[in-house]
Amino acid sequence: MSKSENLYSAARELIPGGVNSPVRAFTGVGGTPLFIEKADGAYLYDVDGKAYIDYVGSWGPMVLGHNHPAIRNAVIEAAERGLSFGAPTEMEVKMAELVTNLVPTMDMVRMVNSGTEATMSAIRLARGFTGRDKIIKFEGCYHGHADCLLVKAGSGALTLGQPNSPGVPADFAKHTLTCTYNDLTSVRAAFEQYPQEIACIIVEPVAGNMNCVPPLPEFLPGLRALCDEFGALLIIDEVMTGFRVALAGAQDYYGVVPDLTCLGKIIGGGMPVGAFGGRRDVMDALAPTGPVYQAGTLSGNPIAMAAGFACLNEVAQPGIHETLDELTTRLAEGLCEAAQEAGIPLVVNHVGGMFGIFFTDAESVTCYQDVMACDVERFKRFFHLMLEEGVYLAPSAFEAGFMSVAHSMDDINNTIDAARRVFATL
């Protein structure tokens, strides 16, 4: 047995499923998950000593690559001054100033510890600010594991929420309305059915949890217009897209102004950080200045703030996003060319430093139904064969891939060459 197999066997006796987040268990592709010993630049190294070109990037945070010296040094320096104080620090102020400067729609920002905390808190704030209970989310979009967001999407344009996980009361989930991503008609139907009850829409500007599905041109502006028409808030969940699709996020890339923004992943530079913020009048409703309660023992942790501050300063350097786009575009085009040579039907969506691989005969993939029609079994075979070639992709047909500026054009070309060999066997 390999070391990964031995560790996985031991882990399953001690940790539910052997992992601390379900997708890591390789359930979506089968087989034994890799246990990682170290990472550097664009590469992961498993406990058996094999290197992989990494397109998971810790599920998004590693936009600069693994083990970036500026972030590593910032963490070391911060740790020497103490690990946690439970009191305000100068770095929290500097971090808030940096974030609000980089994302102009955020007049104020509150730091938390994860993307889930950010979305959960933003929805509570939207409900408190508007005095309304219902929210709209989109099928195939994931916003963390808060109860109100673990809701199963139905087949119709509009479904009353049904819990997608045991432990979520149906009476609670019923306040979550599920609409179809990239379909404004379904959203208008929800507002017309509940015109005075919907507090907010929460949306991934690029849907990264049904692989990678960018918005159609009219979709995000249409959501903004509907929120204005019916008095609801627009929450853009930029946990994945923030600082990756563009420096000011996908909201800037697509030209839409939210009322609240949720951030995570890159904002922590690899440390556990989330944030939410937006309009000053809305944020003023948050405790201690307002009645909507939110708190956290480790929120604004000095080590996490130091890591995030270092990361964002690096990400803000000229040329970063142009490089991400160039690398991702080359990968997407190369994979499509290689698949076409082998007669394999393939669509690769990409925007900024995100991409998604779909085995499908369709010309495009623009919604949850398109994603569900793709060939998952072929993806599973592709994943494992690419792993044998030393390429680590997301172990699920429903997760986006992530590029970093640490990837070289040689890494990209080697990945395309590996895919060409794999496609020949599919």
UniProtKB/Swiss-Prot annotation:
Q: Which InterPro entries match?
A: 4pyrrol_synth_GluAld_NH2Trfase, Aminotrans_3, Aminotrans_3_PPA_site, PyrdxlP-dep_Trfase, PyrdxlP-dep_Trfase_major, PyrdxlP-dep_Trfase_small
Isomerase as UniProt keyword: yes
User: Which EC numbers characterise this protein's activity in its record?
Assistant: 5.4.3.8
Cofactor(s) essential for the protein: pyridoxal 5'-phosphate
A Gene Ontology cellular component where this protein is annotated is: cytoplasm
Q: Which SUPFAM superfamilies match?
A: PLP-dependent transferases
Top-rank lineage group of the source organism: Bacteria
Key word Transmembrane present: no
**Localization:** Cytoplasm
Key words, A-Z? Cytoplasm, Isomerase, Porphyrin biosynthesis, Pyridoxal phosphate
**Modified residue N6-(pyridoxal phosphate)lysine is at which positions?**
K265
Q: Which PANTHER family match?
A: GLUTAMATE-1-SEMIALDEHYDE 2,1-AMINOMUTASE, GLUTAMATE-1-SEMIALDEHYDE 2,1-AMINOMUTASE 1, CHLOROPLASTIC-RELATED
Q: What is this protein called?
A: Glutamate-1-semialdehyde 2,1-aminomutase
